[in-house]
UniProtKB/Swiss-Prot annotation:
Belongs to the fibrillar collagen family. Residues 1-1017 are annotated as: Disordered. Residues 1-16, 260-270, 998-1010 have a biased composition (Pro residues). The lineage of its organism: Eukaryota, Metazoa, Chordata, Craniata, Vertebrata. Its main location: secreted. It comes from Epinephelus marginatus (Dusky grouper). This is Collagen alpha-2(I) chain.
Amino acid sequence: DGKPGLPGPAGPPGPPGLGGNFAAQYDGVKAPDPGPGPMGMMGARGPPGPPGPPGAQGHTGHPGEPGEPGQTGPVGPRGPPGPPGKSGEDGNNGRPGKPGDRGAPGPQGARGFPGTPGLPGMKGHRGYTGLDGRKGEPGGAGAKGEPGAHGAAGSPGLAGSRGMPGERGRAGPAGPAGARGPAGPLGAAGPPGFPGGPGPKGELGPAGATGPSGAQGSRGEPGPNGAVGPVGPPGNPGNNGLNGAKGAAGTPGVAGAPGFPGPRGGPGPQGPQGAAGQRGLAGDPGTQGVKGDGGPKGEPGNSGPQGPPGPQGEEGKRGPTGELGATGPAGNRGARGAPGSRGMPGSEGRGASGAAGPRGPPGDAGRAGESGPAGLRGLPGSPGSSGPPGKEGAAGPAGQDGRGGPPGPTGPRGPSGEAGKPGDKGATGPTGLRGAPGPDGNNGATGATGPAGGPGEKGEQGAAGAPGFQGLPGPAGGAGEAGKPGDRGLPGDQGVSGPAGAKGERGNPGAAGASGPQGPLGPRGPAGAPGTDGGKGEPGAAGAAGGPGHQGPGGMPGERGAAGGPGGKGEKGEAGHRGPDGNAGRDGSRGMPGPAGPPGPTGANGDKGESGSFGPAGPAGARGASGERGEVGPAGAPGFAGPPGADGQTGARGERGPSGGKGESGPSGPAGPAGQSGPPGASGPAGPTGARGDNGPPGLTGFPGAAGRVGAAGPAGLVGPPGSAGPAGKDGPRGLRGDPGPSGPSGDQGMVGPPGPSGEKGPSGEPGTPGTSGPLGLQGFVGLPGARGDRGSPGGAGAVGEAGRVGPAGPAGARGAPGNLGLPGMTGPQGEAGREGNPGNDGPPGRPGAPGFKGDRGEPGSSGAMGLAGAPGPAGPSGGAGRPGNRGESGPGGAAGAVGPAGARGAAGPSGPRGEKGVAGEKGERGMKGLRGHAGLQGMPGPSGPSGDTGSAGPNGPAGPRGPAGPHGPPGKDGRAGGHGTLGSPGARGPPGYVGPAGPPGXPGLPGPAGPAGGGYDVSGYDEYRAAKDYEVDATLKSLNTQLENLLTPEGSRKETCLHAHPGSLARAVVVQGSNDVELRFTFSVLEDGCTRTNKPSRLPLLDLAPLDLGGADQEFGLDLGPVCFK
């Protein structure tokens, strides 16, 4: 080897750097030229000479062009674990557990208040017609009519001899009906008639106002889980999770030159005590302390909002009859109801005879008719000759029953009984199943780099040899100076919980807190023990008059009341329908002889007289056969309600109704005695990262960690002076918190010692504070495509697509929901009489349709045969449950782990999706009666009652006044269609959409600039660190392409995105109703590629669906809205 030459000139700029992996540039080789010569042309590269000593540092070359990316270096040593990531999204709820063992029956609850009466049931089926009543007494004679006009004088005849009086002539035809006189004064009310047969079922009335809550029903079976509620507020931080899975390898670090291992340094002197750390995170909960004495009873809290209505309790015992309340004032007069359909003729009534009407105006003179019957007694006419006495007529038929009076107003509600005593404490429920662990959190950000140690003293220059094998550790060096206090270390292991403290003294009662937000509805506790019946309360003061209540059912028939006084004069009634001709009344008593009239002219000889009148009525014949059923008579007055029927059998349990609205919180009760500690709840999801606490005191020394992987060789350290290794002392007890010491100076950085023996796995440490963001790593290779993400939120509205062509006709779909009212059809021909129909079931009440156009008046059909009475329809099932949430993928079941220690109780997670129906548990013993629940909603009207028995014949009614019935009036014209209703208020804001799918990986960034030139190295020995081959990037691109194609054809193939699609079929077409109640009707077309274009701006993403007329026992309804893209 020659002697070192003088420093040569600065070399040309070095070749491009190795993409940041190797920061080294090659130095210029020492030139033998002692003087600075001119820069020559760059010669061909000679064979490498033996390595000379390093030349002096050349000037830094200009940065080269960005080089090609270097080969991947070996994997760097594993970095310190990052801070814990943010809590992941809550995992899907596990499947519902098996039903728990049945709890012991709870004690009997206190008796509830009686509920308000339900609405009157539907009208019962018509009963059989009762027997005819006995014939009534003859009515009183009517007032005398005015004299008729004089007829024209006949031609004078010869005076004949007076003949014998002829026999009475036959009755002439009835004259025209006179105008109806004003109504007479109201007669005394007759006794109530027997209950008439129920009328036919009336039209469906308008929906009544929401009734008061009914009494608490019996406890229902547990309903299925409800739909997933909105995400609740973040729970309290849960316990530390298990250690996460091993993180992915970091980006490859720069390969350092292998250094010689220095001797192991001895332990330095102990540094000054560091400043007190920030307050650490909360430790694990300690063991449960001894139960303290009960505190004094707190003051009652502020009244909370009313809670949601509890589940329906069992029916309570019937309470004792309350004292009669004071009569309430009469309600306001109701609006005039719609005319009911014409009812069947009622049995004959017993109305009182009305007063005689006033005299009508005189009629026009008619042509002479046949001899009429004897008239009622008239005013004195012009003198005529006295007629012969007439014979007695037969008695007239009995008049119809008068209508019953309306029911009296409902009396006020009686005073409430005292509330029952609170029940005993219920038994503790079973422990819930442990929830599935949440998903792993994201990786935390890289921690900040620690400060570098101060430079050591410069060592002597050694000759650079080839890297040898790693030598044994040298002797320990002397102790270095005390270093500055390092950064805050990771939290130490959690100390053992201290013993429970002594029982504290009883504290003063705190002030009543404000009402907290209403918590979620807890599970229903077991029923409390029955309270003793309270004493009868004093009657309360009469309340203010309530609004008019719903008409209650008729009461039991009362005793016959005394006759009322005459009513005031009523308004003039409309002309009634013309009644059938009555039988002739009795002849009036013989009138006084009138004064003699002037002698008339002699008449001509009369014709032969008509045959005489009929003889007296014969005896009553035998009762004839029943006549055919007449037309439906006018609706009879409501009869008195019959006695309540026997309790029916319990109906089948209906499906669970939709969840009720959230009630207001009830007032907070006084604090109850402390309950027994409940079983530990399942671990809650990890809470959000808490604020940074104060530094905790230094933790105890932990056990040695497991052996780490062999890292890449570090750079050669400086040789330290050998020191003597001291023996390791035992861990002392945990000291008290010291005062913060001053910062010590920074010590030299010692060498990495050999790996210690593998220690036992320590408990999970508490999360450290997040470090600052580390430097940006190198660009990694494109990763493989990730798993398919959750469904994204809908995109913005897209451009209108072209209309697709109509596909083939599909098979006939199931029967659709009833359509809207169509246009009126043409008048059909008169149909034939239908045969007797079977009884139909009661249909569910329909919702009012849009008003139809006025139809033409149809021809009258022939009357059909009377149908049999229909059986009461079954109770309709409850409405469908709310939409089920998206069903999560069920993970494979893991093996059952050992039971862990009870964690602190986490906050309740959000409700899971509706689970599958659990196995029915065994039938338990009947529980005691539960506490009284809130009054339930008013029930639907009950089914029609059975037909009543035939009533007995009524007593004779007095004869009604005889009046001719007018003809039927023509039907009135249909009313005009009503206007559109007002706009509804906007609905509540929907829940937030699901998290969108993860986006595709970004394109690789530009290569970074070359690093600065470093010291030169001999790289001849580094071939072993090269990567075996380049990664296959093409495979990644291909998988990305497949992933994009899958995004374009969701849930299907390229040619058909819907299963069983039938383009052009409107069997299941949707009619969308806008917020302004306008129905948007379109003819839908589905193209084969799943795209639909439209230029109608109203075809926008749906915000809400409200299906109607669903829930029948034979109906199924499903809805699936697939992914929609609006371009």
